[in-house]
């Protein structure tokens, strides 16, 4: 029964692993529900900001602003890449970082700097010797809005100071518990969304002052929403990965148990045969 003992030991090992993956699945499920609620709460406000900016842009088509118009020549690109702090979430981080590499490869003649949100992105950039402009790790719900505000203020400052000529954002958009979409979005210059709006606006004190106040706030909301959606997507991916691992462990335990019972039955049958043979010889 040496083989049986090995199988029994393997069953015990897989059972221990299953307990760990099940616990992680429960924790991830709880965190996912929390961030799913935050995403749903924030989305209407983010959508309203999109509409306000679109209507405003339609009403000032002839007005110019640096955050709208961009630079005449693009030499330096900033990439904000959002990953997780921890692993065990399937291909969540690897697909995001592959998309970042595609964007870098697509701009061989430009200087590229990265703002990493999440340890996995930070560690990857350090390993690959990418120009890491800033890093933000271990974000918690209570500070996410303030961090988004800090990042948006920094990229606007970098844009005005010609440190960045364009800024891109890479993150996972949350769609449902089973579906997310990897998004690559140009943050700066801000795209003028085309809408049919013939409304005439009167600006006080001036268009320049209003845009200078509104556009950074718009970027702040865009980044905050992206952080929430990316975090919800992360916990969804980890929950699903741990569920798959738990299911696989349960299947493995069933197979090993069946194998153990067969080995045990074969050993018992062998012993009975030997006893019968011995009795016949007598």
Curated annotation (Swiss-Prot):
CDD domains from the UniProt entry: F1-ATPase_gamma
Main location: membrane
UniProt GO BP: proton motive force-driven plasma membrane ATP synthesis; sodium ion transport
Cell compartments where the protein resides: Cell inner membrane
Pfam families: ATP-synt
GO cellular component terms, semicolon-separated: plasma membrane; proton-transporting ATP synthase complex
Record-linked PROSITE patterns: ATPASE_GAMMA
Keywords: ATP synthesis, Cell inner membrane, Cell membrane, CF(1), Hydrogen ion transport, Ion transport, Membrane, Sodium, Sodium transport, Transport
Membrane topology (UniProt): Peripheral membrane protein
MF (Gene Ontology): ATP binding; proton-transporting ATP synthase activity, rotational mechanism
Gene3D superfamilies: 3.40.1380.10, ATP synthase, gamma subunit, helix hairpin domain (1.10.287.80)
Key word RNA-binding present: no
Additional comment: The ATPase of P.modestum is of special interest because it uses sodium ions instead of protons as the physiological coupling ion.
Summary of subunit composition and partner proteins: F-type ATPases have 2 components, CF(1) - the catalytic core - and CF(0) - the membrane proton channel. CF(1) has five subunits: alpha(3), beta(3), gamma(1), delta(1), epsilon(1). CF(0) has three main subunits: a, b and c.
Classification via HAMAP family: ATP_synth_gamma_bact (MF_00815)
Family named by the database record: Belongs to the ATPase gamma chain family.
Biological function: Produces ATP from ADP in the presence of a proton gradient across the membrane. The gamma chain is believed to be important in regulating ATPase activity and the flow of protons through the CF(0) complex.
Protein name, per record: ATP synthase gamma chain, sodium ion specific
Organism: Propionigenium modestum
Gene: atpG
